[in-house]
């Protein structure tokens, strides 16, 4: 097929890191995935101009090696208007109504297709991953934030405004910790990476984890330190991860019970670093499912790729350019 000669560039802008790479139409990464930190200004706002500058050399080089590039796909960790490429609300980057799609298109002279990272991830899993033959499933990401997206009756479920799926922003405690979205007590403030780090710091402050105290070496405890301690069987870290798994299971069970889903796919930085979390969520969620059929049939998998959102950003280019013929509502 003529479409086989095309490539796309995927760019995944997360809460702390940017990943990018070149893909063929079958989902194969060409060369390596490049990862750089998100540049922030003094006000802790992600600097969109520096982001564009940082990926420009890669894109220009890719044009030389892959002359038929169908476009650039952007996956971004928050609400994105996929029609005009505007990042409407990105709490972890402190963006509101940033026209990043247009800015990247103008700078790099290629078609640009932008969307939320969880939507991109679900596209990758449906086209190239474990959900190829599934019609009712959910993507869940655990990283700097917590979120998800839905695939219902063979279609992406975008919702009325295109923002469906922010499971991390259901309110669990209206007097709880402040969230980047402007609310307090959002679910992600209990289970995402910063919450795991906060729980680890509390354990160290209380003298409950000499291992995490040693690993952090006098600095603030990070999510990475908690997961390191978990893998060293530290009781405090084991308890933190167990509690996170239980809370995620409770949250997702409500979605599964409501929509009668067949599958959950979990990804994100925390899952990549601690894949055991998937098994623990699988263990707990059975207790909260309503029917015996759901308890029997629900499957929970770790994401198929090292970064499904990145793969999905590239896939979205092929879908929206009509180079892949798969009517999933992209």
PLM region spans:
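ATP-binding/phosphotransfer module of carbohydrate and carboxylate kinases, centering on a glycine-rich
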Residues: 1-71, 82-84, 102-110, 127-134, ...
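A short acidic/small-residue loop/turn micro-motif
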Residues: 36-39, 95, 163-166
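A cytosolic small-molecule/anion-sensing beta-strand core signal
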Residues: 70, 76, 152-153
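A charged helix-plus-loop insertion that forms the helical arch/lid used to bind
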Residues: 85-96
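General beta-strand structural signal in soluble alpha/beta enzymes
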Residues: 112-116
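Acidic/histidine-rich catalytic cores of soluble enzymes
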Residues: 122
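Glycine-rich phosphate-binding loop of actin/hexokinase-like ATP-binding domains
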Residues: 134-191
């Amino acid at each position: 097929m003529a479409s086989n000669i095309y490539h796309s560039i995927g760019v995944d802008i997360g809460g702390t890191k940017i990943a990018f790479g070149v893909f063929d139409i079958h989902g194969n990464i060409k060369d390596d995935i490049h990862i750089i930190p998100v540049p922030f200004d003094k006000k802790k706002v992600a600097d969109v101009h520096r982001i564009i500058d940082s990926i420009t050399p890669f894109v220009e080089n890719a044009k030389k090696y892959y002359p038929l590039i169908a476009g650039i796909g952007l996956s971004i960790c928050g609400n994105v208007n996929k029609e005009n490429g505007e990042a409407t609300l990105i709490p972890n980057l402190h963006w509101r109504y940033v026209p990043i799609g247009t800015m990247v298109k103008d700078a790099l002279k290629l078609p640009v297709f932008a969307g939320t990272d969880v939507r991109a991830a679900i596209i990758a899993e449906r086209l190239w991953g474990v959900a190829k033959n599934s019609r009712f499933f959910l993507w869940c990401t655990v990283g700097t934030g917590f979120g998800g997206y839905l695939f219902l009756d063979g279609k992406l479920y975008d919702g009325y405004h295109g923002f469906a799926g922010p499971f991390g922003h259901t309110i669990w405690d209206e007097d709880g910790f402040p969230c980047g979205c402007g609310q307090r007590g959002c679910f992600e403030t209990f289970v995402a990476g910063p919450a795991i780090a906060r729980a680890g710091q509390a354990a160290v402050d209380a003298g409950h984890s000499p291992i995490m105290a040693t690993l952090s070496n006098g600095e603030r405890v990070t999510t990475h330190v908690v997961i390191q301690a978990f893998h060293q069987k530290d009781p405090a870290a084991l308890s933190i991860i167990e509690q996170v798994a239980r809370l995620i299971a409770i949250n997702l069970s409500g979605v599964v019970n409501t929509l009668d889903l067949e599958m959950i796919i979990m990804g994100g930085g925390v899952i990549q670093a601690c894949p055991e979390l998937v098994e623990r969520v699988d263990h707990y969620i059975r207790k909260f499912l309503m029917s015996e059929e759901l308890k029997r049939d629900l499957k929970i998998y770790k994401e198929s790729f090292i970064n499904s959102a990145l793969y999905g950003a590239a896939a979205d280019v092929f879908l929206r350019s009509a180079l892949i013929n798969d009517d999933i509502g992209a």
